[in-house]
Amino acid sequence: MKESYYISNSCVIKNQKVFKNETLVFESNEADFNAFAKATYKNLQLEYPKFFKMDGLSKLAFLASEFLLSDKNEADNIALLFANKSASLDTDLKHQESIQDKDNFFPSPAIFVYTLANICIGEVSIRHRLKSESAFFCSENYQTEFMLNYANYLLQNQKADKVLCGWAEFLNDDY
């Protein structure tokens, strides 16, 4: 007999607003993403100083995950399946700027570490102590059927008890 799975929660962060299960839960007038992210972080009353060192993509994925995993049980085996269109291009461009000029060559390790899109999964995993399956995919659009099939595989084969799927797109402060 085939098991039925369902979406238990959703989170959308867009245009300085956060929606959980289609209900507006936070709004800010901060147009700049970093200022908006900081306001959202403070609203959640978190104590996780590493947040302020993250790139935009990681902050976006981290904040959405906070809204979705706030009631997580420590024993939950939650897989993470994230996707976007631009991978880590926003951070890649910042890194390129730091190494472009031979006379002013100052690559930043703090930026370089975020030049892989899957680092945002690592940030969420560390925060929530997840030692689970994870994958980050890049495609033009969210591939619903692919993600559904992947999530079903993980659940049906006891690779995970739950799966957090997400589209986390961040480029030039657009999210």
Language-model segments: which ranges?
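Conserved "HGTGT" condensation-loop signature of ketosynthase/thiolase-family condensing enzymes
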Residues: M1-N149, Y153-A160, L164-Y175
